[in-house]
UniProtKB/Swiss-Prot annotation:
One of its GO terms (cellular component) is plasma membrane. Keywords: Cell inner membrane, Cell membrane, Membrane. Could be involved in insertion of integral membrane proteins into the membrane. SMART domains: Haemolytic. Belongs to the UPF0161 family. It comes from the Bacteria. This is Putative membrane protein insertion efficiency factor.
Length: 86
């Protein structure tokens, strides 16, 4: 997880939370993935920051269509620099 979130990440998370609280309840449960795309987006932004987190979120949203089966699709783990081989 990013040690401190950038202003951009905080704004994007705030927008996603607004969607979760204001729009999503009106649409009902539709997401074919676990976690939902909005939860995925927040986790990706917190874990990877604004640029990579946004990219992962956009890729996830583009998979959300009737031809994709959905299912479990967690945010990928960060590569741990301590485990790299020299």
């Amino acid at each position: 997880m990013a040690s401190s979130l950038s202003l951009g990440s905080k704004i994007l998370i705030l927008l996603i939370r607004g969607y979760q609280l204001g729009i999503s309840p009106l649409l009902g449960p539709r997401c074919r993935f676990n976690p939902t795309c909005s939860h995925y987006g927040i986790e990706a932004l917190r874990r990877f920051g604004m640029i990579k987190g946004s990219w992962l979120t956009v890729k996830r949203i583009l998979k959300c269509h009737p031809l994709h089966e959905g299912g479990d699709d967690p945010v990928p783990p960060r590569k741990n620099d301590d485990n790299r081989e020299n």
